[in-house]
Amino acid sequence: MEVQVKKIQGSWDLGYVLHKHTISSVYLGVDEWGHNRFDNTRSEPGEALYQLKYQSDWSQLEPLAAQIKETLLPLFGKIGLIIPMPASTVRARQPVNELAYALGKLMDTPVFDGMIVKAPAPVGSPALKNLHNRAEKDAALAGRFTINDAITNDGHWNALLLDDLFDSGATMDAVCKALRTYKKISYSDAAALH
């Protein structure tokens, strides 16, 4: 899988993404249902993620997890646990959680998918993707994430926060700020596919 690793900045200690999701996008017009149509060219990880999330092609999990392990993990220190980012869309099977478990299996590292608790957005508020700037996103996310004390033993752990898409970084920042309040997490690194 061809990747172009990029460092990402935020409230985490280290952060990287594998590649851009979409390399190019050409507007084709409006279809018969009134939807805008695009001819998208995705990166290899971007196409794998698209197939996983929108075509339910679960065979993409192993190659994506293997690519994260091979390319991104050597850039981080020792990882003690993996925390998938909370999903923004409810699905019967959450792609980021499944990816975290596939990566955890490859690394022999525990996954804590219930550690981050996301409060629902206030009724009538716009979706995060419809907000226009980082300040609006930060305001919409303020106070929405709390920590479930899921680590049952003593100690301090280095966590890898895993997400599929990285845009402005507002959500990952809000989650990392919440993680900083949890005494059992020493530091948090961030990884995303795109």
Each PLM stretch: what is its role?
Residues 83-86, 111-125:
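A short, structured active-site edge motif that brings together acidic residues
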Residues 165-175:
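Acidic, divalent-metal-coordinating active-site segment for phosphoryl/phosphodiester hydrolysis
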Residues 1-16, 173-194:
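PRPP-dependent phosphoribosyltransferase catalytic core
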